[in-house]
Regions:
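Two-component system phosphorelay core
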Residues: 1-120
Length: 120
């Protein structure tokens, strides 16, 4: 049976997050707030860097987003950011654009989950 928890577990690995934070909800809240605050800025900058074909900036921003996604235990977003970083390192604009689209989808899913959770 598919549940909201099982769907959200594929977006953010709550088991890993609880282990990382020893279940401390205050720390988790700080992590969520940090992602909400910094994530959109990184995505806006990343969108411009991809549009301009600025590989060094794409690599740097994908790395930064990967770091905040990893802290949040958003594993699919983390993996997509790593793939984007590698595509930028290879100067492969077609791959960069393709993977950026996946990063954007994963990012939006994380944001929707966090925003929904903050309404509860």
């Amino acid at each position: 049976m598919i549940t909201l928890h099982s769907i959200s577990q594929t977006i953010i690995n709550y088991d890993a997050l609880n282990e990382l934070t020893d279940g401390d909800e205050a720390i988790q809240s700080l992590i969520f707030e940090g992602f909400l605050k910094d994530g959109q800025t990184r995505m806006d900058e990343l969108e411009l860097a991809v549009a301009w074909g600025d590989f060094s900036q794409v690599k740097l921003l994908a790395h930064a987003l990967k770091g905040i996604a990893r802290t949040l235990c958003a594993e699919r977003l983390t993996d997509q950011c790593l793939t984007l970083e590698e595509a930028a390192l290879a100067n492969d604009i077609a791959k960069v654009k393709e993977v950026y689209a996946h990063v954007s989808i994963e990012y939006k899913q994380v944001m929707q989950l966090l925003n929904h959770g903050s309404e509860d």
